[in-house]
């Protein structure tokens, strides 16, 4: 197993178990995490820590499962599923919408693109997923 594959697996296992410290250890000190659908960007360790703690407070039962994962010495891609129950506000989701969805479960499929640092950590990641589909599951958008 490539070291970066192991790193991504460790990262997603940590978020699924609410292990903030292990999750943070996967990222370079100046890492950038961009959630494209939410237009949310966390830059640097403080923003990463604040962001993940806020996420886990809002969705404490977050579960991520890997569908496919490919890495090399510099880049990686991961297709995943995520599920959870919304318990509060999430960065990128207006509070009035979050309030309508509290207590509701969701699941989604998405993908993350990675760039790794010279010391073997995540330098940059960009997450892509179906925002409209999730909002439909949460009952705030009509479903087809």
Predicted regions and their residues:
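C-terminal and inter-domain tail/linker signature
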Residues: 1-144
